[in-house]
Amino acid sequence: MNRGQWLASYIGNNKAVGVELGVLRGPTFKALIKICPNLTLTGIDVFTPDRYWQANKITTTEELLKIQPLSWFDELLEFCREYPYRAHIRRDFTNKAHANFEDGSLDFVFIDADHSMEAVDEDIRLWEPKVKKGGLVSGHDIDMLSVKMAVMNHNPQYEEGPDNVWYWKKE
């Protein structure tokens, strides 16, 4: 079972609102939209090679949007047009995009963006408040030391799922 299938089994046919941080080419994003008919999902990614925006010290959304996105960004936008009320892509930094979501408004967040310890730590800190009580705080790549350290800083009792998924239910 891969991470998309695992998350889809959690969501099922329930009405749910979620965010995926770090979409890349969109395999998990697309799978969730196709499998979960009552899911509204927003995918957030810079859609620019990290080395480019980091080397050029780009830190604002305005600066980011001036850069030509990677080719698969347009493919994901086209996919979203097939599901106009349920599938949304936002080109932004994860530490900026959180401001567009109300606290307690999400059923889940799936964190799979920048895998540095500092970035994962920041994503959890900024996005966990957006998840409803009883919702899922989750992500990918728990097999990476940087991810594991950040996750353990927030919840030492986290659980693991297939395909290197980590998660906990928000209390």
Spans of features found by a protein language model:
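S-adenosylmethionine/decaboxylated-SAM
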Residues: 3-171
